[in-house]
Amino acid sequence: MLVTPARDEAAGIVETMESVIGQSLHPVRWVIVDDGSIDDTSALVNCRISGLDWITLLRRDSAAQPGDFVSKVHAVRAGVRALEGIGYDFIGTLDADISLELDYFKRLFRAFEQCPSLGIAGGHVIEAYDGRLVPQRVSANSVAGGVQMFRRQAFEDVGGLRPMRLGGEDSVAEILARMRGWQVATLFELQVRHRGRALSGSARPTRAWFARGLVNRSLGYAPLFQLSVSAYRAAVQPPYLVSGLAMLAGYAWAALRREARALDPDTVAFLRAEQRRRLLRAVTRQPEPVRCAG
């Protein structure tokens, strides 16, 4: 099962649809949720799904603005509700600006088959902009929110996606899944194309990185880990230096204001224990744990 939240995606949603429709193994059902578009998104989707009874368009009235993370989660939830009563083993989200290789789902589900403890997985996002293809930098035990596929039991274990005012709902799902014993993995051998830039492609990238710092503080990132992440981003992520400093500033600002955590103390403790292990591996140059192969 697949759910795609879409708002004002007329410029590229047909390309996304073609990449799913042409799959060698396509989802049993795909719900595209128009989250209050004011462009031709719905008209284009309606035109393309004619005769394809496994794809449903769901219109949702919404006064959401671009970047409204809560509205996006509610759109996904509306799509999930539309699938009630239908048997399925996997459920995933796919952003409306993503294109997939034609054997993507076949290879993705093969990975789930080979690893019973794999709870969330997805391909490696490649950003296409300015005539370039730029791989997103992502941890091996994390998956970009726009391509997260859940084993059904893992999805139910974490309670689905949680509305987060600042964003980070995909990170919360991953943390809770790992806490419950599920593996989470980006499959680097599976590439997916994102049209344009993601976080770094904001019209105001400094503000976007500041916001990411706010999110990290709300999730309970340990100060030392956040400092190391900020230093890394400053070195490798355009705009260089500014990206890391802006992220650190967002984290510090939220800390000084004593902003409430989005996660409970036990979950924060689990996350920080993970982060300590990651820092230790980085210092001792140990490789990331490899996901199971069978």
What are these regions (language model features)?
Residues 208-294:
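Non-catalytic, C-terminal membrane-associated alpha-helical segments of glycosyltransferases
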Residues 34-43, 98:
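A conserved acidic beta->alpha catalytic loop
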Residues 18-27:
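Short, acidic, metal-binding catalytic loop of nucleotide-sugar glycosyltransferases
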Residues 144-159:
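Conserved nucleotide-sugar donor-binding
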Residues 73-90:
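Active-site nucleotide-sugar/metal-binding loop of Leloir-type enzymes
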Residues 27-36, 58-60:
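Short beta-strand/loop segment that forms part of the nucleotide-sugar
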Residues 87-99:
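Short beta-strand-to-loop acidic/aromatic patch adjacent to the donor-nucleotide binding site
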Residues 99-134:
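Conserved donor NDP-sugar-binding/catalytic core segment of glycosyltransferases
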